[in-house]
Amino acid sequence: MNIEITEYKGQTLAEVTGIPIQSPQEALELLINCAYQGAEKIIIHADQLMPDFFDLKTGIAGEILQKVSTYQLRLAIVGDFSQYSSKSLQDFIFESNKVGRVNFVASVEEAKEKLCA
C-alpha cells in the first residue's frame, strides 16, 4: 500500500493507492496511519475496497464510515458508482455526499476539491 502525502490549497491530503483494503480493521489502520502522518483528509479508490463494502447489508460501509467520523477525518472515495443498481446504496452515497464527511466522487481532482472546500 502506498500513501502519498501532498498539499492542496494549503491543506494536507493523503492519497492511498496499492493493495486492496480487505477488512474494517485494515481500513482503521490505514486511517490512523494517514492521520499520524498529518493528513486528516484521505483519498482512496473504490477498487481498493472489498466488494462487500458496496453491499450495505454487510454493515462494512457503515462500520468504516463510522471510524472516519469517530476520528474526525474526511474521506473521498474515487470511482464509478453508476455501476451499482442498489437504491439503498445510491441513497447512501447521496446522503454521504450531502453531509460531506465522506464523499463519493468520480475523479481525484474532484476529491481534492471536495475535501479542501
Q: Model regions: which residues?
A:
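Amphipathic, Lys/Arg-enriched alpha-helical "gate/interface" segment within cytosolic domains
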Residues: 2-117
